[in-house]
Amino acid sequence: MAKQQPRSGPLARTSRSTATRVLAGLLLAGALAYSTWSLETFLPTGLSPRTTYVSELAAEDQPYGTFFRTLDLIAGLLVLAGALGALLGRTTPLGRTTPLGRAARRGWLPVVGWAGIALFGAATAADSRLPLSCAATADAGCLARERAGDVPWTHSAHAVSSSLAVTGALIGMVLLTFIARRHTAAPRLALARTGPALVVLELLATGWTLASVAAFDAGRGTWGLGIAQRLQLLFIAAWLVVLAWSAVSEARKE
């Protein structure tokens, strides 16, 4: 019996295009939800964006804590769903029929890249379920309790989940941007054009954030910790938007 060949007609192409659009929609919605910390500009949070962690907006003792924790959970689940859709559907970041798609399916880079995005989504969702009990950068009493180890275990767990989220985001950003640069035919998609700059900016913001955290832990001030971390999150969200837009652009070509 002859081996049946996979379908490649108009119906199959339409199905792939629809799947890619859904994936892009999940990523875009996740990026927007992930950026809702910016609403602190309009809300009387009482926390300074220059010196506080973004996670402290969602602390249990903060007036809008439940609101920000809920949005973090939604953001993480949306991005996780998009990444798992890419992995389980054996798709590529930008479709199946392009040079990028053909090259990406032959290697492990897209799998690791999308696994990084999935880790980012899962860890972000976990962050929302492991809230800080108070805002150490704005509350001297909270800081004293934290340094004395007199805070809930969720403080340590939150630090781990936050680190995993950023690590996953960096893995995905670097690898999927590399794939787009290496394999996308001209005219280049937005991810190939803009992705490298966002990756560099994210690395710089991450370095600044780590230095600021070290300074704060050593009692040497915040070094603009709030600004650094907000830039870090902003560049991740912007990259996700670019990825989603590039996926939609590819879907239109199918």
Language-model segments: which ranges?
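Hydrophobic, aromatic-enriched alpha-helical segments typical of multi-pass transmembrane helices
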Residues: 14-250
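Short, Lys/Arg-rich, polar N-terminal cytosolic tail immediately upstream
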Residues: 1-20
